[in-house]
Swiss-Prot record:
Its main location: cytoplasm. Keywords: Cytoplasm, Methyltransferase, S-adenosyl-L-methionine, Transferase, tRNA processing. It is found in: Cytoplasm. The keyword Kinase does not apply. It comes from the Archaea. GO terms for molecular function: tRNA (guanine(37)-N1)-methyltransferase activity. Its EC number is 2.1.1.228. Gene3D superfamilies: 3.30.70.2580, Met-10+ protein-like domains, Vaccinia Virus protein VP39. This is tRNA (guanine(37)-N(1))-methyltransferase Trm5b.
Length: 330
């Protein structure tokens, strides 16, 4: 037996919406028709409605999406985000202004549907600052920010509040791994907690992994142990000040990578490959970056061969996160 609001058939939809607004609708039971009435399952007695005890059928199918069970007013449902990131057992979601008042409902629904998710955070700012982190606002589940994320066969321990990490780049990291050759020396200029470095360590002879964020380096050191790799050298500092020679350089700092190009070219070995990342506008997202690369190639008197370029993902409206791979020959 469960509690249900009994309403005339023709008022059913209006009452259902009202119950959603009140957070009273119990989605775990099905609505039942009884003659000219509907029995709408509720979580608690609701003032102003006739509440009865009823035998209702339980909803047996496990929902596929939090959107199927979340209690938000019908007219706002169209604003519900269709995707969010899951990093280890932590979900991070961008909630539009219209739904900010329902953030906790959304968080609760995510925890309910995704059994592996233990904590949910709402994005509280854009990615900003030198460390490329953002403010996170806790909306559901446990108040934890440290987790272990699995991707491409490696484990990455990290704190989502203290370091940059995006699970959306997993395919890009695998693509770079596939391009890498056995026995190379790699310079990961903006290593973070090591998703490129640790993966590439499986092929490379040596990986220099630099980051300016002490938390990133702390987790990188833990991840080196966690993944039992012995050829990654963590370096805390500004990668412009690190003088190494490498066959492959990864420049995963899209917002500022162009400022580091000169140093990258000075670190690359003859015939080496640079994986450059940037942001660019719709239409020609590569043009500005390719010009910078060619300018510097002229300045250094080296040859540049573009091996590939692609859009990785949308970054903002009409702005793309792009990648350019190029070979440098002396
Ligand atoms: C976009 S994140 C990429 C992290 C990592 N490659 C990944 O895929 O998760 C850029 C990283 O560059 C680091 N960073 C920013 N400026 C730097 C600098 N001058 N030298 C070294 N690292 C820097 C930030 O702390 C941040 O961890």
């Amino acid at each position: 037996m469960t509690l249900a609001v009994k309403v005339p058939l023709k008022e059913g939809e209006i009452v259902r919406r009202r119950l959603i607004e009140l957070g009273a609708l119990d989605n775990t039971y099905k609505i039942k028709r009884e003659g000219n009435f509907l029995l709408i399952p509720v979580k608690f007695p609701v003032k102003g409605f006739e509440v009865v005890e009823a035998e209702l059928e339980q909803v047996s199918r496990r929902p596929n999406s939090y959107r199927e069970i979340v209690n938000v007013p019908q007219e706002l449902r169209r604003f519900l985000p269709t995707s969010f990131d899951i990093i280890g057992n932590i979900a991070i979601i961008e909630i539009p202004e219209e739904l900010k008042g329902y953030a906790k409902e959304i968080g609760r629904a995510i925890v309910e549907v995704h059994k592996n998710v233990k904590a949910v955070y709402m994005k509280g700012s854009k990615i900003e600052g030198e460390y490329r982190t953002r403010e996170l606002i806790h909306i559901a589940g446990e108040n934890i920010t440290e987790t272990i994320h699995r991707e491409n066969g490696i484990r990455l321990k990290l704190d989502v509040a203290k370091v940059y990490f995006s699970p959306r780049l997993a395919t890009e990291r695998m693509r770079v791994f596939k391009m890498a050759q056995e026995g190379e020396v790699v310079f990961d200029m903006f290593a973070g907690v090591g998703p490129f470095s640790i993966l590439l360590a499986k092929k490379a002879e040596l990986v220099f992994a630099c980051d300016i964020n002490p938390w990133a380096i702390k987790y990188l050191e833990e991840n080196i142990k966690l993944n039992k790799v012995n050829n990654v050298v963590p370096i805390l500092g500004d990668s412009r000040e690190i003088e190494v020679k490498a066959d492959r350089i990864i420049m995963n700092l899209p917002k500022y990578a162009h400022e580091f190009l000169e140093h990258a070219i000075s670190c690359i070995n003859d015939g080496g490959v640079i994986h450059y990342y940037g942001f660019g506008p719709e239409g020609d997202p590569y043009g500005w970056h390719l010009e910078r690369i060619r300018e510097l190639a002229n300045k250094f008197g080296v040859k540049v061969e573009v091996l590939g370029k692609r859009v990785i993902r949308n970054y903002a409206p009409r702005q793309y996160n792009i990648a350019i791979d190029f070979r440098v020959s002396f």
